[in-house]
């Protein structure tokens, strides 16, 4: 049995050099484009190669300064684990080699067929709008109830601001609140620039929020037939920076290309039961310390704000007009 489960549909053939590694992920880069080899817990995505089994990649903190070696893929068939020992320079980590039908990772070759290509898009059915809006309200309630305490869910429930106590945390929350207000009240790109890079981690909270916003715009474009792509492109231009992780994630979101857990959630929002929406939401919120929740907050607020009628005197600007 092949240990390679899926290959993202945005992965191009070529040789990729080692970039960075984390507990369940090894990242490779080519021409400013990241491709990630991940385990089943991370799951599929447009630029993910999913291998069956777990990675033994201590420490859990990522590093670029060096990698541990030599390399061994232990097990075969149903189980495959990468073991890494010793110390090597990044240049000594074997490159990732990809063709139209094979992947060479850590000196091991895996073949794949079209059936193993992960498809990062799906067709939306505008006829399911009633179900979608019902499930969206459930999703919003789950965000408020279940999101991590230090996530951006305080934008949905301001009582959560009590979790931000230090001067740094309060300044962070103030900047997020200001940026989100600008985004939804006529100063879209100014708000995006306020949110850009705001927070800690590989993909700061502000960037995760923007990614959720971009995914929402693609969904609204499909459901309503409105031309949101120029807005999404402008948002990406304002949000793009020096962080290759954020840039990669934001570019995929701009183009409506979804990783597995987000795609599963959208499918359940369109057609699922309350129980299935709860399950999909839980899986999304489990990503990172708060990344999944921050993405979810940006997605929910954008769909919610763009779906409600504009009240007289309200400065909210539809997002198909760039401000």
Each model region followed by its residue ranges:
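Amphipathic alpha-helical elements of HEAT/ARM-like alpha-solenoid repeat scaffolds that form extended
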Residues: 209-214
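Long, compositionally biased low-complexity repeat segments characteristic
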Residues: 56-60
